[in-house]
Amino acid sequence: MKHYQAYLIDLDGTMYKGTEEIDGAAQFIDYLNNNRIPHLYVTNNSTKTPVQVTEKLREMHIDAKPDEVVTSALATADYISEQHPNATVYMIGGHGLKTALTDAGLSIKNDEHVDYVVIGLDEKVTYEKLSIATLAVRNGAKFISTNPDVSIPKERGFLPGNGAITSVVSVSTGIQPEFIGKPETIIMSKSLDILGLEKSEVAMVGDLYDTDIMSGINVGIDTIHVQTGVSTYEDIQSKEIPPTYSFKDLNVAIAELEK
């Protein structure tokens, strides 16, 4: 296995599985920390702040810092503030998205006369929230969604994800949003900018082919698939573009790096 100068790392299915630890995850991060190898946690989760993400990782005995976390909410806020500083925004979403938008100097309004509509996962979404978003998009607001995941794994099973919520507005208006999170390149390009390295020096680590592995492929970096989450080894064998590597777990990756 190639020795990369830095890694972009998925969370659920790679670092942990729901509320369960994944063997090899904490050990892999310890290996990176001990060898001073930069890494960022890249997540489509828009509901949590980097501090909250870090708290979850530490519960899993993973030594992480908030400045190592790139959420789809952060990437969305940065993207809008670069395009249109001080823009007005109507948002559907959670605490993580609201915090990211306001920290970026954007003004959140509760009506349909805004510059942008931003949709992130909102477990308390209502018909009225979707109505305001729909009217704002029809009025000409730019339409952005933090990520396209149509379902998310929960203890009860797979529940509606942000892509499902977003689809209500896109179907109603006939306008497709710009997605920020994986597998799109915006969140990945932001992460690469933070690292400041060449693409050939960075690898994406994740379990889900359509999201994690494709995000690496789309942005032009190598990919490391771990068989600890959703996509199995058999699944990835049928793909037109396979990951650069596929390992049973991150313990195997450590063993490869220590050769």
From Swiss-Prot:
Signal peptide: none
Cofactors, names only: Mg(2+)
Superkingdom, natural source: Bacteria
Keywords: Hydrolase, Magnesium, Metal-binding
InterPro entries (alphabetical): HAD-like_sf, HAD-SF_hydro_IIA, HAD-SF_hydro_IIA_hyp1, HAD_sf
EC number: 3.1.3.-
Record carries keyword Magnesium: yes
An annotated Gene Ontology molecular function: phosphatase activity
Gene Ontology terms: cellular component: cytoplasm
Keyword Heme: no
Listed CDD domains: HAD_Pase_UmpH-like
Described function: Catalyzes the dephosphorylation of 2-6 carbon acid sugars in vitro.
Family to which this protein belongs: Belongs to the HAD-like hydrolase superfamily. NagD family.
Name of the protein in question: Acid sugar phosphatase
Source organism per UniProt: Staphylococcus epidermidis (strain ATCC 35984 / DSM 28319 / BCRC 17069 / CCUG 31568 / BM 3577 / RP62A)
